A protein has these predicted regions:
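Nuclear receptor C-terminal ligand-binding domain
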Residues: 182, 186-191, 230
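Intrinsically disordered, low-complexity activation-like regions
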Residues: 1-173, 194-541
Length: 541
């Protein structure tokens, strides 16, 4: 079978997760169709040019890639994949999709499939002895397969289309140009956490500003523009998380305008591959804002302390179980309730019909409860990992680092109130949050074989934060191995090379902090850990 990999590579992928191995491959035609050269056989009739319809092979490749996208990419871009997944492409209307969008979907699907096919080979880099995963800007270039030239061909066509859109005055600030640039940003992140995504982020920012700003576009109620804005918003926020405080500028403060839209276009995180509840994403935004404000020596430290305490309280008081219960039921209920809902036109029913419908509703409710129970605990653990990761980011940057840098020890910084009768010092709160994060991650990854509904594949950022906040000593070796091993597996699950880039960065941080003899209170600050000349990475999806 002509495909993206030979049998040995397929076996490698199967070793990672047999239950998730795609049942079919997209056939692409590289040199000689991806097959080994063979001697020509005399007398064998060859097909003549023109027997296939015009563009038949290109159309078939496009449809195959769209089908792959719907079946293997879309399910991993939402908290729970249901029939209502808004990211699925309607194949019956594929001819109405702009060519440039189709080109990006083809490139994305083939890249996803190639990375998954080579996941075992790629993710074992740096596992020999004490060797490290090297930091590479273009890890994608090392992958080999017949689909590679096809991927770059379609990617090049996309870039040409972008240039054409931007060269025309009437379209350079249009919906299509904005959507293409934001999608290209996601494609760059898929291929490398160190890729050219910052350039696309700034280009999208310029278009949004030209069109009246984020608030104006977010209230247009255009579903396609809304999806693009969500991706832009998330990358902008998480880019600030990974930016040293002294490099932040006034644009960080403008992120507060996103807060009003966390329940509308972002939908409280349930339709995103970064399913961070709105309360917690708002906390990240406000942490970024306080970090940026703290650069100014004229800022009132007492006021910053007060705001920092409020942020901590909002994170610590968040109820992950309640949030999960609400959203899991919302996500699972449409498919179950549709078949059992009584007709609104049927108003005249006798008592037996009413009893029958009542029994049907009881059965449907029981089925819904069973479905919710099957995934509720798993999704709760994922939500808790995000909550504890945000808590660690808050404690590290607003409490531990600011106290060290300012030399102050005010009551707000010296202790953190978890309840009316219990106070923990910041160091103890940090250790407790890290322990809870690791415990939730272990519970989540213990059910890795759950199948397609397993949401542990969305734990990229919590894993990275756990790694950032660990001491490099021998007592944490097992947990560091767990974090790195899980990130390596995400290369396969997500069809994304960024998790491997995250491993390389964490290993570098651990090595630097170990050499510096930092542990406990003497650990490097958040900003000091981010100082990597020439490296600008993003590690959350």
């Amino acid at each position: 079978m002509s495909g993206l990999e030979d049998d040995s590579h397929n076996q490698h992928a199967l070793q990672l997760l047999p239950s998730q191995q795609p049942p079919q491959w997209i056939a692409v035609h590289g040199p000689n169709g991806g097959r080994r050269p063979r001697a020509a056989r005399p007398g064998v009739p060859r097909p003549r040019a023109g027997l296939d319809p015009i563009d038949y092979k290109n159309h078939k490749l496009t449809l195959d890639c769209l089908d792959y996208y719907n079946n293997f990419v879309c399910p991993d871009m939402v908290l729970l994949d249901t029939t209502a997944n808004p990211l699925r492409v309607p194949l019956e209307f594929w001819r109405y999709i702009p060519d440039v969008v189709l080109d990006m979907l083809v490139s994305t699907s083939l890249t996803h499939q190639l990375i998954r096919a080579k996941a075992h080979e790629v993710s074992t880099i740096g596992m020999e002895g004490n060797s490290l995963v090297p930091i590479k800007r273009h890890r994608m270039s090392a992958l080999q397969g017949p689909s590679v030239p096809v991927i770059y061909k379609y990617h090049q066509r996309t870039l040409m289309a972008v240039n054409q859109e931007l060269s025309k005055t009437e379209s350079r600030y249009g919906d299509l140009a904005l959507g293409i640039i934001i999608t290209l940003m996601r494609v760059e992140i898929q291929q490398s956490a160190f890729g050219a995504w910052p350039a696309h982020l700034e280009a999208a920012r310029a278009i949004i500003a030209q069109r009246g700003g984020f608030n104006r576009l977010a209230t247009m109620e255009d579903v396609y523009v809304g999806e693009g804005l969500v991706n832009f918003m998330l990358v902008d926020i998480m880019n600030s998380v990974m930016t040293p405080t002294w490099l932040m500028d006034e644009r960080t403060a403008t992120q507060t305008e996103y807060i009003a839209h966390l329940h509308t276009i972002y939908k409280d995180g349930r339709d995103s591959d970064f399913p961070c509840p709105a309360t917690l994403l708002e906390a990240i935004i406000r942490i970024n804002d306080v970090r940026a404000l703290s650069r100014d020596e004229d800022q009132d430290e007492a006021e910053l302390d007060r705001v920092s305490g409020q942020i901590f309280t909002s994170i610590a008081s968040f109820n992950a179980a309640d949030w999960t219960r609400t959203h899991v039921r919302t996500l699972l209920s449409p498919g179950v309730l549709t078949t059992s809902s009584p007709s609104s036109d049927d108003t005249a029913r006798d008592s037996s019909d009413e009893q029958l419908h009542s029994e049907s509703r009881d059965v449907a409710d029981k089925g819904l409860d069973d479905a919710v129970a099957a995934v509720h605990d798993m999704c709760t653990d994922l939500t808790k990992t995000i909550q504890y990761a945000v808590l660690l980011y808050c404690l590290r940057t607003l409490h531990m680092d600011r106290r060290t840098s300012s030399g102050m020890s005010s009551p707000q910084l010296a202790s953190v109130w978890l309840s009316d009768d219990m106070a923990l010092d910041v160091e103890s709160a940090h250790r407790s949050a890290l322990d809870m994060l690791l415990a939730a991650l272990h519970r989540l990854w213990d059910v890795e074989a759950k199948g397609k509904d397993w949401c542990g594949k969305l734990s990229f950022w919590p894993l990275f934060i756990a790694g950032m906040e660990m001491d490099p000593g021998p007592e944490t070796q097992a947990e560091r191995d767990f974090v790195c091993g899980s990130l390596r597996k995400l290369v396969y699950y997500l069809g994304d090379l960024s998790p491997l880039d995250a491993v390389s960065v964490l290993q570098l941080i651990w090595r630097r902090t170990a050499v510096g003899g930092c542990s406990g209170r003497q650990r490097f600050s958040w900003d000091e850990r981010l100082v990597m000349p020439g490296i600008r990475g993003l590690y959350f999806f």
